Amino acid sequence: MYSISFQEDSLLPRERLAKEGVEALSNQELLAILLRTGTRQVSVFEIAQKVLNNLSSLTDLKKMTLQELQSLSGIGRVKAIELQAMIELGHRIHKHETLEMESILSSQKLAKKMQQELGDKKQEHLVALYLNTQNQIIHQQTIFIGSVTRSIAEPREILHYAIKHMATSLILVHNHPSGAVAPSQNDDHVTKLVKEACELMGIVLLDHLIVSHSNYFSYREKTDLI
C-alpha cells in the first residue's frame, strides 16, 4: 500500500476568500496565500506566522530587504522576490489612490470625476464618498440605484459605511439622468436629513453634489444647507 500526499496548505484560505471575501481573512491567511506552499518540515501557515512574528507592524514588511526576507525560515529567493514584488505593487496602488484623492478635494474637481462615473447613467445612482481626517477619500460606496425617494427615511445605511471605515466626513453624490442639475425639494430634504444624522454621529457632511453629463450642482457652493 502506498499513498500520495501533496501540500496545499493555502487552499483553505483561498476557498474562504472566494466564499467570504478577502476582508474575512487574517493577515496570516493572506500571507499564506502569497507564499503558496511550505516546506517538508514547516507548513505555509507556520512560515506565515513566523514572518508576522518578526514584525512590529505590517508596514515593517515593506522595509525588509530581499536578504532579510530570505533569512526567514521557509522563504527562498523566489518567494522573497515574489513577496517584494507584491508588496511594491500594493504600495504603488496606495500611492496612486492617495494622489488621486488629494487631487479631487475641490467640489469642481470631484464633480468632474463623478460626472465621468455617473453622468451617462440612465437611472439615479446615490454614491457616498467617505473621508479621513486628512480629507482623503478612503472608501466609495454606491448606496442605491433607482429613485432618491427610497433613501429619504434611511440615512442609516450611509452612516453604516462611515462607521465601518472610520470616516470623519462624507460627501454625497447623485446624478440626474434628465441632465438638469437643479436640486428638487426631495434633494433638499435628503440633504437635511443626512446632515442631521451625521451631526448626531459626529461626522461632517462636506457636500452633496448633483451631476449630469456636462454640469454639476454643489450644495456647499450654492446653498446654506451644508
From Swiss-Prot:
Q: Which PROSITE patterns match?
A: MPN, UPF0758
Gene Ontology biological-process entries: proteolysis
Tell me which UniProt keywords the record has, alphabetically: Hydrolase, Metal-binding, Metalloprotease, Protease, Zinc
| Motif interval(s): JAMM motif | 174-187
Q: What SUPFAM superfamilies has UniProt attached to this entry?
A: RuvA domain 2-like (SSF47781)
Any GO molecular function: metal ion binding
The question of whether Metal-binding is a record keyword is answered with yes
Q: Which residues form the MPN domain?
A: 103-225
Positions annotated to bind Zn(2+): H174, H176, D187
UniProt lists the family membership as follows:
Belongs to the UPF0758 family.
Question: What is this protein identified as?
Answer: UPF0758 protein SPJ_1027
Q: Which organism is it from?
A: Streptococcus pneumoniae (strain JJA)
